[in-house]
């Protein structure tokens, strides 16, 4: 219709007005049909196209066979989202037995699958000794070429390639997700149970059967009901199982951060019959499966975790509609859930198994199965190897949204593998993983059939049914023990909930903000402490000093021209939301910065002792030289910078110089390029940072638009002794200046003062 509007003639009324009056009563033309057609051919064509379009539309919607329309809509969606739904002929897939590997004739039902990147660990040697279980070690590009362990089957990259699995085309060479090859190999060689483990876990008492329900049917199966979380609250969709086993202040990797503060024990449980706990998640003593936020904030840098859980707490099941994080370190899979072993390849490394776990739990409900969590089954030793927050980005960004999506998702497929493929495709559409995992899922499912796995049957889903009322007789009470967290050195108390909640809130707010610190003091005695203090909150802590220290990752910079060093840091962390600069004589009370707008500039323009105007005394003094440099730079500024600066300084007489001590300021991402442009304008000029920074800020934006958060900081211009600093400090202020830190003892005194605002800091001293 838009095309028709553009080419349509003007209305007849306007044409009549334009005709001379003498033509109004001219003799009419003879109505010849052929001439009429030639005169109106364009109208006929347009009307004809319109009629055909409308007819086609109604035909597609009203015909009994709507396949054409559905196909059209599907293709439109695919073209918009660049996704292709795999089409698989399941009946054409033939079972292929292993005929080439040295283990072609070997078959056993119970397997332990691990990924190895180093020579065999003592824990892995212990796994080999577990009776009745076969260890399968999966190598990658980081694995030593001469890797060998008696009693274990080792699949190198070359050995994996010879298996001809479809998934090999999609796997990275240097990742633990190559365990997916091992799962298929185990299934091909008779697996009925697969224990998904790592090479740092030691099975307690060396007996998996003592801890897990290895047998679900038959004489050896435990015929007993299992405690189950109550389904009474439909809005409760995820739980922290560590609370049930005695540790309220510990949370598992993959638990949404907004749920960390929920530490109350269950009012009551229900029960479920055993036999369908096809995925069994074990708890790990020592180093449990915790995320980088917990690992980086709940202990000192070199102190290994040694957390213990209650071994006497009963196992607990999850009802449909409620989920729990599941990992690849300590989990038993029964054959009915082998399809759920697939490790995604398009997400960050520390998110792969957790996303797999949530994906698998949702699909498990389609089979009438459920996940159960078991008391401590292994002891994992902490090697004090922190992993970066970025490795978990797909967890902290997406996991809460993923859980909500999975609970709402429904499928109309009639075969289970089609249901799996449908969910994987929709998850790619929603951005939880990419098309790589759609293709990987298709290859995985075909490989499962090829190695002899039988597709499970779908069962009715209970999510859409009215929940059964929980009667008084159905309620089962269990009060978990409250074990002390030994690593904290204190007994846990009720306030831990709000303390952890605050920490998570601060981390969520500043987790993508880079802190840049210039150390005037000796970095050998303070750099690690500053990173420990602020690294809990910010994305990273970049430390600069007048002297470089490669061992401590301290970069060299001159304070007088510190602003010239910042653009390189901006480029290195280009995805950051913003950058806070602070000198080590200024304390940043981050808990009082939450209300500040991270899209605005922050500086101390409202602090009169920090932001000052100086009138140079003569042409030769230092202030006059700096003022001349400012004039020269302003004259070369692009119009938007120059207008801002002159508007901000219009009340001065043109000879005064604006200065700022610049111990603390913030540059948001949207002003990073402006800051860099201004640095380039300065070039090699010897402009002092106390002059350059206020000039930059006044050029980038109007002071009226600065966020006033730093305006209430405690600021004294004279140097402070430690005793005067103690009386100067206020936990209510956004920042405090000055504060002298020259050694570990000074740092401890500072932390004790800051603990008024962040009580968890007392763990560091």
Swiss-Prot record:
<keyword id="KW-0735">Signal-anchor</keyword>
<feature type="glycosylation site" description="N-linked (GlcNAc...) asparagine">
    <location>
        <position position="235"/>
    </location>
</feature>
<keyword id="KW-0328">Glycosyltransferase</keyword>
<dbReference type="Pfam" id="PF03385">
    <property type="entry name" value="STELLO"/>
</dbReference>
<dbReference type="GO" id="GO:0016757">
    <property type="term" value="F:glycosyltransferase activity"/>
</dbReference>
<keyword id="KW-1133">Transmembrane helix</keyword>
<feature type="topological domain" description="Cytoplasmic">
    <location>
        <begin position="1"/>
        <end position="43"/>
    </location>
</feature>
<keyword id="KW-0808">Transferase</keyword>
<dbReference type="GO" id="GO:0000139">
    <property type="term" value="C:Golgi membrane"/>
</dbReference>
<dbReference type="GO" id="GO:0005794">
    <property type="term" value="C:Golgi apparatus"/>
</dbReference>
<feature type="transmembrane region" description="Helical">
    <location>
        <begin position="44"/>
        <end position="64"/>
    </location>
</feature>
<dbReference type="GO" id="GO:0052324">
    <property type="term" value="P:plant-type cell wall cellulose biosynthetic process"/>
</dbReference>
<keyword id="KW-0812">Transmembrane</keyword>
<dbReference type="GO" id="GO:0042802">
    <property type="term" value="F:identical protein binding"/>
</dbReference>
<keyword id="KW-0472">Membrane</keyword>
<feature type="topological domain" description="Lumenal">
    <location>
        <begin position="65"/>
        <end position="765"/>
    </location>
</feature>
<protein>
    <recommendedName>
        <fullName>Probable glycosyltransferase STELLO2</fullName>
        <ecNumber>2.4.-.-</ecNumber>
    </recommendedName>
</protein>
<dbReference type="GO" id="GO:2001009">
    <property type="term" value="P:regulation of plant-type cell wall cellulose biosynthetic process"/>
</dbReference>
<dbReference type="InterPro" id="IPR005049">
    <property type="entry name" value="STL-like"/>
</dbReference>
<keyword id="KW-0325">Glycoprotein</keyword>
<comment type="similarity">
    <text>Belongs to the STELLO family.</text>
</comment>
<comment type="subunit">
    <text>Homo- and heterodimer with STL1. Interacts with CESA1, CESA3, CESA4, CESA6, CESA7 and CESA8, but not with GOT1.</text>
</comment>
<comment type="function">
    <text>Probable glycosyltransferase regulating the assembly and trafficking of cellulose synthase complexes.</text>
</comment>
<keyword id="KW-0333">Golgi apparatus</keyword>
<feature type="glycosylation site" description="N-linked (GlcNAc...) asparagine">
    <location>
        <position position="723"/>
    </location>
</feature>
């Amino acid at each position: 219709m838009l095309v028709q509007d553009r080419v349509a003639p003007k209305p007849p009324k306007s044409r009549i007005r334009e005709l001379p009056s003498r033509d109004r009563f001219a003799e009419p033309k003879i109505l010849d049909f052929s001439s009429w057609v030639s005169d109106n051919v364009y109208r006929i064509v347009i009307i004809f196209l319109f009629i055909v379009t409308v007819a086609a539309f109604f035909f597609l919607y009203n015909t009994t066979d709507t396949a054409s329309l559905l196909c059209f809509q599907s293709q439109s969606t695919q073209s918009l989202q660049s996704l292709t739904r795999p089409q698989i002929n399941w009946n054409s897939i033939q079972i292929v037995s292993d005929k080439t590997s040295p283990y072609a004739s070997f078959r056993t039902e119970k397997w332990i699958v691990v990924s190895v990147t180093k020579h065999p660990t003592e824990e892995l040697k212990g796994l080999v000794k577990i009776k009745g279980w076969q260890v399968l070690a999966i190598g990658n590009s980081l694995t030593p070429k001469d890797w060998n362990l008696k009693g274990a089957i080792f699949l190198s990259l070359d050995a994996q390639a010879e298996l001809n699995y479809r998934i090999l085309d999609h796997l990275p060479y240097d990742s633990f997700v190559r365990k997916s090859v091992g799962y298929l190999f185990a299934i091909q060689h008779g697996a009925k149970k697969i224990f998904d483990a790592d090479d740092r876990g030691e099975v307690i008492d060396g007996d998996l059967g003592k801890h897990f329900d290895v047998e679900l049917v038959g004489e050896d199966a435990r015929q007993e009901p299992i405690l189950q979380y109550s389904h009474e609250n439909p809005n409760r969709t995820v739980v922290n199982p560590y609370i049930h086993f005695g540790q309220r202040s510990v949370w598992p990797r993959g638990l949404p951060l907004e749920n960390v503060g929920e530490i109350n024990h269950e009012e009551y449980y229900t029960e479920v019959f055993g036999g369908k706990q096809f995925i069994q998640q074990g708890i790990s003593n020592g180093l449990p499966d915790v995320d980088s936020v917990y690992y980086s904030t709940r202990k000192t840098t070199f102190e290994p975790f040694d957390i213990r859980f209650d071994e006497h707490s009963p196992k607990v099941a999850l009802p449909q509609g409620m989920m729990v994080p599941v990992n690849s370190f300590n989990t038993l899979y029964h054959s009915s859930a082998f399809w759920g072993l697939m490790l995604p390849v398009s997400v960050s490394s520390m998110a792969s198994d957790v996303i797999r776990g949530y994906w698998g739990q949702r699909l498990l409900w389609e089979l009438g199965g459920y996940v159960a969590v078991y008391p401590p089954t292994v002891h994992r030793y902490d090697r004090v190897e922190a992993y970066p927050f970025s490795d978990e980005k797909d967890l902290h960004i997406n996991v809460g949204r993923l859980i909500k999506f999975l609970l709402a998702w429904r499928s109309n497929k009639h075969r289970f593998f089609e249901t799996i493929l449908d969910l994987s495709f929709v998850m790619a559409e929603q951005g939880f993983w990419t098309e790589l995992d759609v293709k990987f899922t298709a290859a995985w499912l075909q490989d499962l059939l090829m190695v002899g796995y039988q597709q499970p049957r779908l069962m009715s889903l209970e999510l859409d049914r009215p929940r059964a009322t929980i009667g008084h007789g159905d309620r089962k009470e269990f009060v978990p023990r409250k074990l002390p967290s030994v690593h904290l050195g204190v007994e846990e108390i009720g306030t831990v909930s709000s303390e952890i909640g605050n920490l998570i809130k601060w981390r969520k707010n500043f987790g993508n903000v880079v802190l840049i610190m210039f150390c005037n003091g000796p970095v050998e005695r303070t750099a690690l402490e500053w990173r420990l203090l602020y690294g809990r909150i910010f994305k990273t802590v970049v430390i600069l000093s007048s002297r470089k220290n490669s061992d401590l990752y301290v970069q060299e910079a001159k304070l007088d021209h510190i602003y010239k060093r910042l653009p390189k840091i901006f480029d290195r962390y280009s995805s950051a939301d913003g950058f806070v600069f602070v000198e080590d004589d200024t304390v940043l009370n981050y808990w009082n910065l939450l209300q500040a707008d991270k899209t605005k500039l922050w500086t101390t323009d409202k602090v009169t002792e920090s932001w000052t105007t100086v009138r140079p005394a003569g042409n030769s003094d230092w202030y006059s030289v700096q003022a001349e440099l400012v004039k020269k730079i302003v004259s070369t500024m692009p119009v938007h910078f120059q207008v801002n600066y002159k508007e901000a300084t219009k009340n001065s007489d043109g000879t005064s110089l604006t200065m700022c001590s610049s111990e603390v300021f913030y540059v948001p991402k949207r002003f990073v390029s402006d800051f860099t442009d201004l640095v380039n304008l300065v070039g090699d000029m010897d402009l002092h940072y106390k002059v350059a920074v206020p000039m930059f800020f006044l050029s980038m934006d109007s002071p009226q638009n600065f966020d006033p958060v730093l305006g209430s900081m405690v600021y004294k211009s004279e140097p402070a002794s430690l005793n005067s600093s103690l009386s100067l400090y206020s936990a209510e202020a956004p920042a405090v200046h000055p504060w002298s830190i020259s050694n570990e003892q000074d740092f401890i005194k500072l932390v004790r003062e800051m603990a008024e605002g962040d009580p968890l800091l007392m763990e560091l001293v």
